[in-house]
């Protein structure tokens, strides 16, 4: 005999199912569940009077070695570049083990995931699960950046620096073997995945290559060190030899050449361009053109995202401080002013919406905010829906195409750009279990739970002296997986394969998991998931207006943004 309940009652019990829509935070963006792995009437849920009990939803006889997961997240909505669906997600040995239907095959049919005695349960009903974010543009200045980023949903930080030196504040570079070794050692106690960018400036390949052998997973070229065609070519030659990425902050002042000269120096080799719009630095006024090239993986940094009525005004002082400029020197002021063009900033959001710009990142404390990359990515998506309407294929209360495009910008695409997508960047079986669980009304703003390597490392928790977990103030705090030797299980240090071959982990007694970067030099723009468009892009040299395939591309500055004051007191 079948039993019927209302759709609302079902949603209250097990979360939304196929055809249901969910608003993300206070935006105009809605996800719509496309598939549900659950068998209706056979759902598993944990709690008093519920299903996951010995002999019911839990198998009480099988030992862990018989493919029993360590943790199952039940009835959760997965939002990933691969799709929008509802499932039970099993974690085992720090990886995503299986995605499907959980339960006990002794009493249930079509069970993909067997819940056993060894299995912990995280209730995902009504929640959204995403991959942990990946920030590829981090200036390693202060250690507090790590917790700030983690509490925003970022689980991998790639960048450079040695602390608050002037060069680190400006250039995202960890120079030389000694500094690289020290930073790799410092990463050991932090619940975050890390990768280091070395200095990509040298007249010969040897001093660049030694940084890669020391552990750098990429080389950074920055105009403050001189982004010359010679530096670009030498860095790319080393990258081709050692299968690493080159990140480029190009020549704002056009000292050593114009954008055409930089394109010529790159010579068709893959490169990851930072703040490709140009306000963060790069050939004035037309760096943005490189986003059309098949060998360029173009990124934005978050201070220009989205374009608002305050964006231009805040940037002048930001440039002056970040690049050690003197406001009393007219040439320094002119340099800063040349980087800030409302016309190209206005085009940037649209280029993201069209899938031309592929990646978002922070530029932490150096013209960017390390805890806002995820929030600002979704603010852009919201602003674009409000001003440009739905994307092709989307519908009322269904923005899945736009959502998949935008989530790819801070998950899978940065992972691909740095050769770590075989480990992190998506919710797929076999990947390292770096996952973020969100309450929809706080989506993109404040996570409920951050999981790293299958361990809970940061969580929304109430007063620790409370009789229950929920008394105010509820704040995001590090939990057990972020402490002691658990950090070595929950987190990864990414190294070049040359550094692994040189036994750097043993030399430094690194205890974190080690993974090598790979497959970087074979990449093209076509590898950027859902963000691989390559139209003709032109910039008017007098008005700075941006044209895509001959059509003017611009947007009005937002007067207000979602995911802002409603969620933050400060």
From Swiss-Prot:
<feature type="binding site">
    <location>
        <position position="275"/>
    </location>
    <ligand>
        <name>Ni(2+) 2</name>
    </ligand>
</feature>
<feature type="binding site" description="via carbamate group">
    <location>
        <position position="220"/>
    </location>
    <ligand>
        <name>Ni(2+) 2</name>
    </ligand>
</feature>
<dbReference type="GO" id="GO:0016151">
    <property type="term" value="F:nickel cation binding"/>
</dbReference>
<dbReference type="Pfam" id="PF01979">
    <property type="entry name" value="Amidohydro_1"/>
</dbReference>
<dbReference type="InterPro" id="IPR032466">
    <property type="entry name" value="Metal_Hydrolase"/>
</dbReference>
<comment type="subunit">
    <text>Heterotrimer of UreA (gamma), UreB (beta) and UreC (alpha) subunits. Three heterotrimers associate to form the active enzyme.</text>
</comment>
<dbReference type="GO" id="GO:0009039">
    <property type="term" value="F:urease activity"/>
</dbReference>
<keyword id="KW-0533">Nickel</keyword>
<feature type="binding site">
    <location>
        <position position="249"/>
    </location>
    <ligand>
        <name>Ni(2+) 2</name>
    </ligand>
</feature>
<dbReference type="InterPro" id="IPR005848">
    <property type="entry name" value="Urease_asu"/>
</dbReference>
<feature type="binding site">
    <location>
        <position position="137"/>
    </location>
    <ligand>
        <name>Ni(2+) 1</name>
    </ligand>
</feature>
<dbReference type="InterPro" id="IPR017951">
    <property type="entry name" value="Urease_asu_c"/>
</dbReference>
<feature type="binding site">
    <location>
        <position position="363"/>
    </location>
    <ligand>
        <name>Ni(2+) 1</name>
    </ligand>
</feature>
<protein>
    <recommendedName>
        <fullName>Urease subunit alpha</fullName>
        <ecNumber>3.5.1.5</ecNumber>
    </recommendedName>
</protein>
<dbReference type="GO" id="GO:0043419">
    <property type="term" value="P:urea catabolic process"/>
</dbReference>
<keyword id="KW-0479">Metal-binding</keyword>
<feature type="active site" description="Proton donor">
    <location>
        <position position="323"/>
    </location>
</feature>
<dbReference type="InterPro" id="IPR011059">
    <property type="entry name" value="Metal-dep_hydrolase_composite"/>
</dbReference>
<comment type="similarity">
    <text>Belongs to the metallo-dependent hydrolases superfamily. Urease alpha subunit family.</text>
</comment>
<comment type="pathway">
    <text>Nitrogen metabolism; urea degradation; CO(2) and NH(3) from urea (urease route): step 1/1.</text>
</comment>
<feature type="domain" description="Urease">
    <location>
        <begin position="132"/>
        <end position="570"/>
    </location>
</feature>
<dbReference type="InterPro" id="IPR011612">
    <property type="entry name" value="Urease_alpha_N_dom"/>
</dbReference>
<feature type="modified residue" description="N6-carboxylysine">
    <location>
        <position position="220"/>
    </location>
</feature>
<feature type="binding site">
    <location>
        <position position="139"/>
    </location>
    <ligand>
        <name>Ni(2+) 1</name>
    </ligand>
</feature>
<feature type="binding site">
    <location>
        <position position="222"/>
    </location>
    <ligand>
        <name>substrate</name>
    </ligand>
</feature>
<keyword id="KW-0963">Cytoplasm</keyword>
<keyword id="KW-0378">Hydrolase</keyword>
<dbReference type="Pfam" id="PF00449">
    <property type="entry name" value="Urease_alpha"/>
</dbReference>
<dbReference type="GO" id="GO:0005737">
    <property type="term" value="C:cytoplasm"/>
</dbReference>
<dbReference type="InterPro" id="IPR050112">
    <property type="entry name" value="Urease_alpha_subunit"/>
</dbReference>
<dbReference type="InterPro" id="IPR006680">
    <property type="entry name" value="Amidohydro-rel"/>
</dbReference>
<feature type="binding site" description="via carbamate group">
    <location>
        <position position="220"/>
    </location>
    <ligand>
        <name>Ni(2+) 1</name>
    </ligand>
</feature>
